[in-house]
A protein has these predicted regions:
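Metal-dependent phosphoester/phosphodiester hydrolase catalytic core
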Residues: 1-394
């Protein structure tokens, strides 16, 4: 099984798709969302789009049904994506950019009042998604969670943490003051109940989770394990960092979650989810969205091991190296030092993840390409881990 996410057409070539298509060990591909992006031709990550002949159509931010259909068509012109669809079966779920950035049930960060009805926009986006993507429609088009089984080896549950019942994210920006962060209020507000999967989907997860299968694999969009900013940021000169990062340096090295769009913004429901999946023999939680590679042990609030999280790098979207440059290796190292359950991270390379699933272990392979800015590239050395059944990573 391979899995991937975050394929941004103007950001770079889909070389990792080509490598997945060529990998004869892969029987199935999971795409965990951000299959496409909604921005205008000169928007996010488009700096090299003209040079690479990867300007999107339509050239404005997509809002209408025709817009979403045309954007899907733009992506499907890519020969590497065509090759992947022609050579491998794919199971897909959406994340936010199939609609617009940081979507929740009733709105989105990247949807303003002058862009019309969000409900209509969401309906247009999901209609185009079902028209273009390898997914069957059901009676309720907003319910895309579903499960697949492989003998008594795998129970694969594909989830929707994005669109169906997600409450609005807590806005961390409101807690910053000049040279101060309102930590106590933020941490108290973070603990308040918020839906992410929501009651209906959690009930379904509970009904499908049991110990009949050696491995329960959850394909979903966002990082689930707690993530804290690395301590090294406290010692970096601010002028070497992008301006939007400056205020976050106040959080570096502290046990303060910084990304409330992830499960970190929904800690109460995360505990409910962890309690449910304890009924499985052994859990792997797959994630996309972050554009970086991660592998972590997962523990509940009582420090009980519940599974292993594996986060996929982006196919082409910018990751840490595009923000931090040469500092990224040290930042990766500091991330591990500042997050006790984080085993390894890579914010430099783009690519995908392969899982070789056996009864007693799963071998996890992070596959990378040397560049997304040219169609001439090299396969990079693979980083691998072995996850033993029902055991944390050492």
């Amino acid at each position: 099984i391979a899995f991937c996410s975050c394929s941004n057409y103007p950001a770079g070539y889909f070389n990792a798709y080509r490598e997945m298509a060529r990998n004869e060990n892969i029987d199935l591909v999971l795409h965990l969302g951000d299959y496409l992006y909604e921005y205008a031709w000169d928007g996010y990550a488009s700096e090299s789009a003209i040079q690479m002949d990867r300007v999107v159509d339509p050239n404005h931010e997509i809002l209408s049904l025709d817009d979403y259909r045309r954007r899907h068509a733009t992506y499907r012109k890519d020969l590497d994506l065509k090759l992947l669809h022609a050579s491998k079966p794919m199971i897909v779920v959406w994340d936010d950019h199939e609609i617009t950035n940081d979507t929740w049930e009733g709105g989105a960060q990247n949807h303003s009042s002058d862009e019309g009805s969000f409900k209509k926009r969401k309906d247009f986006a999901t209609q185009a998604y079902f028209e273009w993507m390898p997914i069957r429609e059901n009676k309720n088009k907003k319910q895309i969670w579903r499960n697949f089984t492989v003998g008594n080896l795998i129970n694969l549950l594909m989830l929707d943490t994005r669109l169906y019942n997600r409450d609005k994210q807590l806005d961390i920006e409101k807690y910053f003051e000049i040279d101060n962060f309102k930590e106590k209020k933020y941490m108290n507000d973070l603990k308040k109940p918020r839906n992410l999967l929501g009651k209906t989907q959690l009930k379904w997860v509970k009904s499908k989770t049991n110990n009949k299968y050696k491995w329960s694999i959850f394909g979903q969009q966002i990082l689930i394990g707690p993530k804290y900013l690395p301590a090294i940021l406290k010692f970096v000169e601010l002028e070497t960092l992008p301006s939007y990062v400056h205020k976050y340096v106040m959080l570096a090295g502290k046990k303060i979650p910084y990304n409330t769009d992830q499960w970190d913004g929904y800690p109460k429901e995360r505990e409910e989810f962890f309690e449910i999946i304890k009924n499985s023999q052994s859990n792997l939680i797959l994630a996309g969205d972050s554009h970086n590679s991660w592998i972590s042990n997962l523990r509940d609030n009582n420090d009980k091991f519940v599974g292993v999280e594996i986060g996929a790098p982006s196919i082409s979207s910018p990751n840490f190296v595009d923000t931090f440059g040469e500092m990224t290796t040290e930042i990766d190292k500091s991330f591990v030092e500042s997050n006790e359950d984080l085993v390894w991270t890579n914010g430099i390379n783009k690519g995908y993840v392969e899982l070789e699933v056996s009864f007693n272990f799963v071998d996890v392979h992070f596959h990378y390409v040397s560049t997304v800015k040219s169609q001439k590239y090299e396969k990079l050395q693979t980083k691998s881990f072995r996850v033993n059944h029902a055991q944390p990573l050492a």
